[in-house]
């Protein structure tokens, strides 16, 4: 390892306030040319057509003054806010890419909400080698990162393929491709030919029927305004769910962040454990069963099945119709559908024996998908750990 010299970051990087480069309008469009940046994970938050105040003295590092997150930038840009510093490397001492990579492994407590660069972060000392040695280290880091990125891209494609496969499984299941041809003896009010003319052909033992004929559907209740009035939650003991908690639950909802007290319960409704929850606003067509008695707002619909339909069958069918239900939502800031849309949703109905068979076939395939996805997620986590390991070795002179 050649001799490395210690410097404070402020000796290696000069800073500039971002104020002249802050975007004036948040009317972003992918059709516009200039990216608007944040130093956080989102990085490019949109594109602007503004032509003044574009930063173009490149390359630079943008530094989030509150979280200490950084991004390396080698293209003209504007910024979202003043919550950052624009850092320029002293190229007589350090390569911009080298110091950027070095900053990725600095351990720093940023739990206090304040600006850090001037008083604290810039005082951190790091060791750097000669410029030729820096070039070699950067080249080796990027060679290894390129190999790692190729692997990560393959893993991400695998996850995308799994999502496509899941939808294909659901599509085939509700077109009767897994059928064992049990005869449906139940006489119900079937959907008309007009209502089903654009729907897939299903086995002759099956019939199409509106979801409202298979169970009771009802919106949750949260009548009081404002909805976050503290008195609703005083002495809370009744779980109050949000659409995000339905989405996060996957199958059974047992976790929640809010609880109604008696005042809250009086203006709501307590739904029993086992109710199928279906979201109709923000997160559309997310489903999960209540693992507890709970209240929920009118952005969630509760479904209670009749004796001739299995709730798991309905849950999987709603999952298969997610894109279709999204299409019913008007083009507003927050997507939503109404109760009528769910009530009139046409469901392929079959005997209870067949429903059990469909559920088993779906869940067997989904279990395989889940196991593969867990393996992929572990590999992605390992790839990120490997990235940190590469950087650590690089700056210990071990690459």
What spans do the regions from the language model cover?
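Amphipathic alpha-helical coiled-coil/heptad-repeat segments
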Residues: 1-6, 128-184, 344-399
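Non-catalytic DNA-recognition/assembly elements of restriction-modification systems
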Residues: 1-20, 30-42, 127, 131-138, ...
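Basic, amphipathic alpha-helical recognition segments used for DNA target recognition
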Residues: 8-12, 67-128, 211-216, 247-254, ...
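Sequence-specific dsDNA recognition surfaces
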Residues: 8-58, 69, 75, 79-83, ...
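Short, conserved phosphate-binding/catalytic loop or strand-edge motifs used
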Residues: 117-122, 143, 167, 186-189
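Intrinsic disorder at enzyme termini
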Residues: 172-173, 179-198, 202-203
